Design a protein with these regions (language model features):
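Polybasic/polar functional segments that serve as interface/processing modules
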Residues: 1-51, 55-104, 111-113, 240
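Active-site helix-to-loop segments that bind/position phosphate- or nucleotide-bearing substrates
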Residues: 129-331, 336-338, 342-347, 371, ...
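Short amphipathic alpha-helical interaction segments
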Residues: 291, 459-470, 538-549
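Glycine-rich/acidic phosphate-handling loop/turn and adjacent ATP-lid/helix
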Residues: 327-372, 415-431, 499-505
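A short, conserved structural fragment
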Residues: 394, 472-482, 551-562
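Short acidic, hydrophobic short linear motifs in intrinsically disordered regions
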Residues: 444-456, 524-535
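Short, cationic-aromatic polyanion-contact patches
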Residues: 482-514, 559-583
Length: 583
């Protein structure tokens, strides 16, 4: 880790007043704290992180230092290698910071096939942790089981269901399924009778139905697994039931039957409860639902198809919850395999927890349609994001916490009138459409990081990084979390000012002009950009932007032509500002 990265991380910790999901600081003057094992396990099981030894959180992250950094490095490396299973290999180093030695370790996330990381001394169940916000939480036995299942290909959907026979199948679904198989996969299925074809497709295991076969083509799977269903609840308030009049819900549906029927019933319930919006199209008007149906269909299918079907989860249903400000779809079991929150939406990214179920549903259509339930091409979430973009809505927020996965759809137009007026009040010229979308997301109180920005705008990571960096340089955004774990918030003087009115938000306070601040910092001396950042506390990108402005105006000059050189220094010219000349 570079010194500048460490300084930025510590500045963020001090600004936040506490640790966060990707950074843990501990006072460790002479020995490793006992809780280090938990933190190392948590980082390795989540998204990786940075451990800083020698910072005292109780004293505002004061650099108290480490007395013998070489020994501390060796002790930490030995603990990672000998006390944790599998052994961890973090990047460990010492930095001199504010007169104290800090030992810094960068812990990478383990690949799915190696999780969970746990403390050997207490065993896998008691010694496995996960990072939640700024703390380390012990994994539940169910979460440990899911991580172990991710080490290979789960086979829960292939298991035979005791007491079932071919008579428990929906024969209309079976006829359509076999017809498609014989048409699309004639070499494998054309010459097989019904029983043989169902066995080859793994709908039948011997004389019993597989779990996948029962769920996809069964007449009533809930006869054997009552909770393998979908529930839909429409709540009257943002927090759920309305305590003022005792209304618990506006609508409540239990969707049962095979997966095609559950998807169909869920969409019927959603249509019944969604508001319609009128939009102008050409010379006429069109009625649209408040959420695009394509996005909802993909989300419901994903939840039913990619959920955990291990025995431990058979008592948990897929939940769809509608609130006035959002729609939440949640399923048991987090993301599987190589899929991560950061690559959701990347075309072709796919890992199938329930491979047999997916294969069957490729040739199982929705009721009254020729469209298959799923394509099994990793295209579901990209289609979901595209539908939300086309509808000018904010992208869904995805959350993976190992034991469950959820998609939350905000109920507002991304570039509504209030957001457009606020962005215009910033008086920033040359913003791209995607930058305006990113600002609008923060205006609506949503989380903004590189992934969310890409999802909202269909950009690659490089372009997203450049555009977010430009917003930082303009003084509109403030990065937090360090480079690797960066997320963004609105700068204080760019945020909409609070207002007592329930109408439009007041325009932001006028953002500071940094020219005088930088000129004062220069004085009669020369300084590098890094020197000026240290003196003023401005972000490096913001400093770069204002130095460019001052150079263009002739108020400063550079000592070298190559402004990219870290050695270039700046000094004031004889030209004076309007304030200084009294103009």
């Amino acid at each position: 880790m570079l010194y500048d990265d460490l300084a930025e991380i510590i500045a963020n910790l001090r600004g936040l007043g506490g640790d966060h999901a990707f950074v843990e600081a501990k006072r460790a003057e002479s020995k490793l704290p006992k809780s280090v094992r938990e933190t190392l396990s948590a980082f390795a099981n989540t998204s990786g992180g940075v451990l800083i030894l020698g910072l005292d959180e109780t004293q505002g992250f004061e650099a108290t230092g480490v007395r013998d950094p070489a020994k501390m490095e060796a002790d930490l490396a030995a603990l990672c290698s000998e006390n944790l299973e599998p052994p961890l290999r973090p990047l460990i180093g010492t930095h001199r910071f504010e007169g104290a030695d800090l030992v810094v370790a960068e812990i990478p996330e383990l690949p799915p096939g190696s999780k969970p990381s746990f403390n050997r001394g207490v065993g896998m169940t008691q010694g496995s942790f996960v990072r939640v916000a700024d703390g380390d939480r012990r994994l539940s036995p169910y979460e440990v089981q899911l991580m172990m299942a991710n080490r290979g290909q789960p086979r829960d959907d292939e298991q035979p269901v005791a007491g079932t026979t071919i008579a428990n199948l929906d024969h209309a679904l079976v006829d359509t399924f076999l017809s498609r198989l014989r048409r699309h996969r004639s070499r494998a299925f054309a010459n097989l009778d019904t029983t043989a074809a169902l066995r080859r497709a793994k709908v039948l295991v011997g004389t019993e139905l597989s779990l996948a076969g029962l769920l996809a083509l069964g007449e009533y799977p809930q006869e054997f697994f009552p909770q393998l269903m979908l529930t839909f609840v429409h709540y009257p308030t943002k927090s759920g039931p309305d305590p003022r009049n005792g209304t618990r819900f506006i609508d409540n549906v239990a969707a049962e039957g095979p997966i095609p029927v559950m998807v169909d019933e869920a969409l019927i319930a959603l249509r019944r409860n969604m508001k319609r919006r009128s939009t102008v199209r050409g010379a006429g008007r069109a009625e649209t639902y408040e959420y695009p149906e394509t996005a909802l269909r993909e989300a419901v299918v994903n939840a039913l198809v990619h959920r955990d079907y291990s025995g431990t989860s058979h008592g948990t249903q897929v939940q769809v919850e509608m609130y006035p400000d959002r729609l939440l779809i949640r399923n048991p079991g987090g993301l599987y395999g190589s899929v991560r929150e950061e690559n959701l939406g990347v075309e072709g990214t796919s890992s199938a927890r329930n491979a047999t179920l997916l294969k069957i549903l490729e040739d199982t259509p929705l009721p009254g349609s020729d469209r298959p339930i799923c394509e099994n091409r990793g295209s579901g979430i990209p289609a979901m994001l595209a539908a939300m973009r086309d509808a000018k809505l904010s992208p869904p927020r995805f959350a993976d916490d190992i034991s469950a996965f959820s998609a939350t759809f905000p109920n507002h137009t991304l570039m509504g009138d209030d957001a457009v007026r606020w962005i215009a009040s910033l008086d920033e010229h040359g913003l791209t459409d995607s930058q305006c979308h990113g600002l609008a997301m923060l205006f609506h109180g949503e989380t903004l990081n590189n992934q969310a920005y890409r999802n909202a705008n269909d950009l690659d990571s490089r372009v997203a990084t450049e555009e977010l960096g430009d917003l930082v340089a303009r003084g509109l955004l403030v990065p937090a979390g360090g480079r690797r774990y960066a997320h963004y918030t609105l700068a204080e003087d760019a945020a909409p000012a609070p207002t007592d009115s329930t109408d439009s938000p007041a325009p932001p306070k006028r953002r500071a002009d940094r020219r005088e601040e930088i000129l004062d910092a220069l004085g009669d001396d020369e300084a590098t950009r890094a020197d000026l950042v240290a003196v003023t506390g401005l972000h490096d990108r913001t400093m770069t932007r204002w130095l460019t402005v001052l150079l263009r105006q002739g108020l400063i000059e550079a000592t070298e032509r190559n402004l990219r050189s870290p050695n270039v220094r700046y000094r004031r010219t004889s030209k004076r500002t309007l304030d200084e000349t009294g103009g």
